[in-house]
Each structure stands twice: as structure tokens, then as C-alpha cells.
Regions:
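Short, basic and Ser/Thr-rich N-terminal targeting/leader segments
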Residues: 28-29, 80, 129
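Ligand/cofactor-recognition surfaces for anionic moieties
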Residues: 1
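Glutamate identity and glutamate-enriched acidic tracts
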Residues: 11, 40, 45, 55, ...
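N-terminal "arm"/small-domain region of PLP-dependent enzymes with the aminotransferase-like
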Residues: 4-65, 73-74
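Conserved N-terminal alpha-helix of the aminotransferase class I/II PLP-enzyme fold
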Residues: 43-95, 117-125
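Conserved PLP-enzyme active-site core in the AAT-like
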Residues: 4-5, 16, 21-22, 83-213
Length: 213
């Protein structure tokens, strides 16, 4: 999810966010479950434009699906984001967010107060891929700066740490990241109706949607 503006009440966005409007054939208000695999193209030129990303549209279900698209748009709208990508799990979102900014030889600085599954993902899987993970005590935001060097590609934290529920100093660490040119990635465990990390300087927001969807 990437930052943009928002204006509607969150309750309205939760119900009506995204580009879906009532079905013109059935007048159904709820978003249908589209069981898609592939899509029909209007012409060879249409297909060419879609694959060349010259115009928006559905290409293949492993890339996009109309039901997923509404979910992505709705979550992005709730967070005040430009766009979102739905993945298979919260752990996939955590890995995806890091692997988009870091590669072998790079490092990230992560809060010590995070979900155990994420700690294992970072401490074992990311390190096996060559991405060093440095853990910082968030009780002092300067700990993130102390662990930063020219190979640091991201800061990572949870809004409310799982399971301690201590509040992460988003604004302070985001400001350190801004000065260092490093994005702060936040797993918004608090849900956007309680906290919007973008409002406090986060660059990327991720979710495990089973927590609140």
C-alpha cells in the first residue's frame, strides 16, 4: 500500500470502497466472487496493450482478479493509500515488502517486538537469502539509527507489537528513515480505523487481514 489522500468516513469506505458499483444486470450490491482463470481479449491489439501495460485490464487470474481488485482498492482506501496488492498470507506480505527493496548483501533494521512468525521468517529465511536482519529495541528510536549503514534498505515494525501490544514510535523512526533515505514498513496490527501509519510517516503498510477483515 502506498500513500495518497482520503476523504470519506472509514465506515463508508469499509462498505463501499473500491471501484465496484452494484451489478447492472442483477442490481446486487455485494461484491460477487469471480471464479476466474483466464480472460477474453477484445482484439489482438487489446491483448498487446494489456501485456505492455499501456492500458489497465485483466490479463490472467494469478496476476489479477475482479474480486481481489475490490479488496485491494478497499484496503488501500481505508489506509489512505494509492494502491495495494493482495497476497496469500500476512507472512507473504512481510516477505514481499522486504524482497522488493533488499537483496543479498543488504540489510534491514527490524523492531525486536514483532510477531514470532515474522521473527522466524526474518531471522531464518531472509538471512538464508543473504539479507541480514538487525533487531533494534523500539523503546529508544535512536537504536534504529545506530544499526543503520549504507546497506540498510528498510526499517520494519508493527503498530501494536504481537503479543506485547506496546505501541511502536512510528513518527520518530519514520523521521530517522526520512533523513537516512530508508523507508519504514509497518505491519498495521492496530487496523486503519484505529491508526493509519501513513499519517505518521510510514512509507509502506502491510496487513495480515485475518486480524480485522
Amino acid at each position: 500500500i502506498f500513500m495518497t489522500t482520503k476523504s470519506r468516513h472509514p465506515e463508508t469506505v469499509a462498505l463501499h470502497g473500491g471501484n465496484f458499483r452494484s451489478d447492472t444486470t442483477t442490481n446486487a450490491v455485494a461484491v460477487p466472487i469471480y471464479q476466474t482463470t483466464s480472460y477474453e481479449f477484445n482484439s489482438c491489439e487489446h491483448a498487446s496493450n494489456l501485456f505492455a501495460l499501456k492500458e489497465l485490464g485483466n490479463i490472467y487470474s494469478r496476476i489479477m482478479n475482479p474480486t481481489n481488485a475490490v479488496l485491494e482498492e478497499r484496503v488501500a482506501a481505508l489506509e489512505g493509500g494509492m494502491a495495494a496488492v493482495a497476497l496469500s498470507s500476512g507472512q507473504a506480505a512481510s516477505a514481499f515488502s522486504i524482497q522488493n527493496v533488499a537483496r543479498a548483501g543488504d540489510n534491514i533494521v527490524c523492531s525486536t517486538d514483532i510477531y514470532g512468525g515474522t521473527w522466524n521468517l526474518f531471522n531464518n529465511t531472509l538471512r538464508a537469502l543473504g539479507i541480514d536482519v538487525r533487531f533494534a529495541d523500539p523503546s529508544n528510536p535512536d537504536n534504529f539509527k545506530k544499526l543503520t549503514d549504507d546497506k540498510t534498505r528498510a526499517y520494519y515494525a508493527e503498530t501494536l507489537a504481537n503479543p506485547k501490544l506496546n505501541v511502536f514510535p512510528i513518527e520518530e523512526v519514520a523521521e530517522i528513515g526520512r533523513k537516512e533515505g530508508i523507508p519504514l514498513i509497518v505491519d498495521n496490527t492496530a487496523a486503519p480505523l484505529i491508526c493509519k501509519p501513513f499519517d505518521y510517516g510510514a512509507a509502506v503498510v502491510i496487513h495480515s487481514l485475518t486480524k480485522w477483515i
